[in-house]
């Protein structure tokens, strides 16, 4: 089975964030050749572990690569990309620094599951587990970002300073820094490094 063929339709989302549905694959970001190749090989490799046909997976699923290169777009436009994939079975592939964000989107939207791409885990089994629909809230392995932390992350990603954020959120600057520190602990990184 090959996952490469012609394009059948494209979805455009503001500022170059696009989701491309090819007749035989559905990934986001479509320009991430390494993600595409690796995911294709993994899915073919786990064919015997999954209950659904490969054709159904190609037709009904969206696999989203949440890595540090794409986080700014996903954070700034989460309502847009969530709307663009409505009706699809969304699987988030989360790098270590994006696990808490993946958990936030799992809890706050219609995400099928999260595959934690940490080095110590068997990604094949985790991917099959999610595709087979067995991923549940009890499977969340890390903290999730709170709604307030997410608002502060979004505003920081847009270049807003803590004082401006405090004014908008109707809280003190100290509170903004506290939420930011809590989010950074969950993300294993400073926010400004994740969303330059």
Swiss-Prot record:
Q: Which conditions up-regulate this protein?
A: Negatively regulated by H-NS. Positively autoregulated. Also positively regulated by IHF.
Domain of life according to the entry: Bacteria
The record's section on InterPro entries has:
Sig_transdc_resp-reg_C-effctor, Tscrpt_reg_LuxR_C, WH-like_DNA-bd_sf
Q: Name the GO cellular-component terms.
A: cytoplasm
Residues in the DNA-binding region are 162-181
Indicate the segments forming the HTH luxR-type domain, all copies. Answer: 138-196
| Gene3D superfamilies in alphabetical order | Winged helix-like DNA-binding domain superfamily/Winged helix DNA-binding domain (1.10.10.10)
For this chain, one GO molecular function annotation is:
DNA binding
Per the record, the similarity remark reads: Belongs to the EcpR/MatA family.
**What is the name listed in the Swiss-Prot or TrEMBL entry for this protein?**
HTH-type transcriptional regulator EcpR
Biological classification of the source: Bacteria, Pseudomonadati, Pseudomonadota, Gammaproteobacteria, Enterobacterales
């Amino acid at each position: 089975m090959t996952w490469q063929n012609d394009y059948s339709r494209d979805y455009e989302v503001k500022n170059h964030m696009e989701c491309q549905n090819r007749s035989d694959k559905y990934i986001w970001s479509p320009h991430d050749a390494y993600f595409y190749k690796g995911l294709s090989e993994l899915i073919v490799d786990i064919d015997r572990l999954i209950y659904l046909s490969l054709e159904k997976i190609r037709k009904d699923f969206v696999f989203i690569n949440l890595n540090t290169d794409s986080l700014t777009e996903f954070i700034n436009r989460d309502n847009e990309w969530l709307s663009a994939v409505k009706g699809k079975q969304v699987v988030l592939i989360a790098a270590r620094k994006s696990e808490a964000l993946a958990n936030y989107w799992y809890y706050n939207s219609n995400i099928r599951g999260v595959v934690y791409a940490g080095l110590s885990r068997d990604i094949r089994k985790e991917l099959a587990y999610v595709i087979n629909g067995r991923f549940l809230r009890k499977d969340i392995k890390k903290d999730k970002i709170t709604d307030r932390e997410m608002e502060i992350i979004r505003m920081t990603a847009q270049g807003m300073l803590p004082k401006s954020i405090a004014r908008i959120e109707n809280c003190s600057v100290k509170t903004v820094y506290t939420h930011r520190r809590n989010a950074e602990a969950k993300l294993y990184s400073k926010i400004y490094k994740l969303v330059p």
